[in-house]
Regions:
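ASCE RecA-like P-loop NTPase motor cores
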Residues: 7-282
Length: 285
């Protein structure tokens, strides 16, 4: 695992009126960018010290590395606010498909003990997508989020129900598994951890998805899978397969550090390692 400390490219020139793509191309063409890419590919290099970028320039520089590197990146910012700004900048450049936010599961501070369901979904989505081995993921987080333990990879695998279009599976088996995972049977799903059955259709709201899934069967065969809007019930996107995950904080054995969960080839980027370690220690639960 390599560690990148923010950041080291300085550009000079008139950048007024440039689009985000044009600015990104300026950073990509900088000679120091080639040096950075070479250092990150060198497995003998464990730490790279960088300097020279301020504000959104760090996001532009980071986006070039993320786009051209297949291994995951984890950017650790100082706090929720700073991480939020950095995440917003990256999504403006790279889109939202590969850029993920890993927040604390608590609404305010860990010490108040108030969980936030939306944050728990984001955390579970990150773990689920890392477990799948997706390439090019970029994760933005901060010390309070890293202080919380997560489930192990084995635990996540054991508690994940995978379904694919064309697969033959007994609907009773699915509902039994959902029940064993702690999902609540309801007439209509409206929040994570719920499922509903209407004829040949099973609606289920996974803790690893922003939207619930509608799984349509033809006999015992999965005919289609779609995400849908809770309020309008209208379909959003077709899926070839899905992973359904329960509330891991309740059903799982939460004993693993997030930094132990991520792949070994992950690049970590942070401003101050010693300060970060101290902050995680203070917030540790």
């Amino acid at each position: 695992m390599s560690v990148l400390r923010f950041f080291f490219v300085i550009l000079r020139g008139n950048f007024i009126g440039m689009t985000i793509t044009e600015l990104q191309q300026q950073y990509a063409a900088h000679p120091n960018m080639a040096v950075m890419k070479r250092l990150l590919k060198d497995t003998s290099v464990q730490t790279v010290f960088c300097g020279g970028l301020c504000a959104s320039a760090a996001s532009l520089f980071s986006s070039v590395l993320v786009q051209e590197g297949g291994c995951p990146f984890v950017f650790i910012l100082g706090d929720l606010e700073e991480a939020g700004y950095f995440y917003h900048d990256l999504t403006q450049i790279l889109g939202t498909e590969k850029v993920l936010f890993f927040p604390s599961s608590f609404r305010r501070s860990i010490k108040y003990g108030q969980k936030d369901a939306a944050n728990e979904i984001l955390r579970t989505e990150v773990l689920s997508r890392l477990q799948k081995g997706e390439e090019g993921l970029c994760i933005v987080t901060y010390p309070d989020a890293l202080a919380e333990k997560v489930v192990s990879r084995k635990e996540l695998s054991d508690k994940t129900l995978k379904l694919n279009v064309g697969e033959k599976v007994d609907t009773t088996f699915i509902t039994d598994v959902l029940h064993s995972y702690g999902f609540e049977y309801v007439d209509y799903v409206y929040e994570p951890g719920q499922y509903a059955v209407r004829g040949s259709i099973i609606d289920v709201f996974s803790f690893a998805s922003e939207y619930p899934y509608r799984i349509d069967f033809f006999g015992d065969e999965v005919e289609s899978i779609r995400t849908f809007e809770v309020e309008s019930q209208l379909s959003r996107e077709k899926k070839s397969g899905v992973s359904i995950v329960p509330d891991l904080a309740v059903t799982g054995d939460v004993t693993t550090s997030f930094l132990d969960f991520i792949p070994k080839d992950t690049t970590l980027a942070m401003r101050d390692f010693l300060w970060l370690r101290e902050q995680i220690g203070r917030a540790h639960v």
